[in-house]
Amino acid sequence: MNDEELIEFGRQLAHPRGEAGLEIAEMLNETNSGMTNAATDALKITDGNVLLELGHGNCGHLDMLLDRADDLQYYGLEVSEDMYREASRRNASKVESGVANFFLYEGERLPFEDETFDRVITVNTIYFWKDAGAMCRELARVLNPGGVIALAFGEKSFMKELPFTRESFTLVDSDEVVLWLELAGLTIEQKLNKVEKVKTRSGELVDRPYAVVSASKK
């Protein structure tokens, strides 16, 4: 890809739109699956939990989340109208039954009351938050006492080598994330560092180091 194409690819990752956005969302279902599973493991979901996800994309992973326990309820937030529509279409039966609920938001203030959710998950979205510290405070606000949040993200040392992250991305490392969560009043439960094989757009397999940080509200 030339520079212009790389920049556009990065913008699509931040805010998928149009046919290209739908294609990228399908790709992310595959490339994000390991991180999504690891973050879900860190949540320790139990029966009856109410879940919130920030940046769900087309939400092709919803069945995996809902299979973790019984009587779960899922809420998804997206800044991308196309992803909101695609996730709603793809999971129409669960929307109709009230198990899944999808919403658009502007990317900063979460449109929910205090202490609404038992578990919060977000995968590869933190780079696009306008103010990561403020968002961590928002996540803490909507989390129930005893609730758990899990954030999964590529480590800065790896992400900075990817040419499409030069624009639209604010790269982070796990120590920064730990600090933001602690300043939001949360207690760190786990900081997990992992490496997985992922396929690039050219088909090459590369090692991707990533982190999962989980925290609870006492």
Identify the residue ranges that each predicted region occupies.
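Conserved alpha-helix/loop element of class I SAM-dependent methyltransferases that forms part
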Residues: 30-49
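A short glycine-rich, Lys/Arg-flanked "PGG" loop and its adjoining helix->strand segment in the class I
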Residues: 133-145
